[in-house]
């Protein structure tokens, strides 16, 4: 594994914790890969990632979703993980059974790296970001290998099959 370092104000090398992100991209910068990169950077980490989907949305609704071919996502992830390595892998929007399955197979190659599984299912505007048939694939393939699962309350309702009371 290569070290990811920069020099601090005193010209000393600073080592970063490396987080590899596998998530969707959206134009607002308030969710997905863009938001994850900001969050990791704000915590002093080094973020790298592979885009799973390109989402066309505005503040009102999701207009279209384009999925990146699974093999391209896996290739990008392997290029980084085998060369640089990661201290953590975080997933975001995976959208389909094919993506969930492909990413699960990839993550199984890196059993020793902690995994944050964010089951992105519903946009902040309430639009579906995960095909219904992919919910079970998350439960069967990704959740068992997760170090932590981070659903929001809407996603928790989908996973539980019942309303969740937020107080």
Regions found by a protein language model. Give the residues of each.
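Small-residue (G/A/S/T)-rich helix-start motifs and N-terminal tracts that mark the onset
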Residues: 7-88
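A short acidic, helix-capping loop that chelates divalent metal ions and anchors anionic groups
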Residues: 55-63, 123-128, 156-160
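Conserved phosphate/ATP/ADP-binding segment of small-molecule kinases
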Residues: 132-167
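Glycine/small-residue-rich loop that forms an oxyanion/phosphate-binding "nest" at active or ligand-binding sites
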Residues: 81-141
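Short, small-residue-biased leader/transition segments that mark boundaries at the very start
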Residues: 1-6
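Fold-independent oxyanion-binding glycine-rich loops
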Residues: 22-25, 30-31, 51, 91-93, ...
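Non-cysteine beta-strand/loop elements that form the S-adenosyl-L-methionine
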Residues: 48, 52, 114-119, 142-154
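Alpha-helix N-cap and loop-to-helix initiation/capping positions
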Residues: 64-72, 130-134, 164-166
């Amino acid at each position: 594994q290569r070290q990811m370092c920069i020099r601090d104000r005193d010209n000393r090398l600073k080592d970063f914790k490396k987080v590899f992100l596998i998530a969707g991209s959206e134009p607002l910068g308030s969710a997905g890969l863009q938001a994850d990169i900001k969050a990791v950077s704000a915590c002093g980490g080094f973020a790298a990632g592979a885009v799973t989907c390109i989402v066309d949305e505005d503040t009102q609704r999701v207009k279209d979703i384009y999925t990146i071919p699974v093999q391209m996502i896996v290739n990008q992830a392997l290029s980084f993980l085998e060369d640089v390595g990661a201290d953590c892998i975080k997933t975001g929007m995976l959208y389909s059974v094919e993506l969930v399955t492909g990413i699960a197979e990839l993550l199984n190659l890196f059993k020793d790296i902690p995994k944050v599984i964010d089951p992105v299912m519903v946009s902040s505007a309430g639009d579906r970001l995960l095909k219904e048939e992919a919910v079970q694939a998350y439960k069967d393939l990704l959740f068992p290998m997760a170090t932590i699962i981070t659903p929001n309350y809407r996603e928790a309702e989908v996973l539980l099959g019942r309303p969740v009371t937020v107080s």
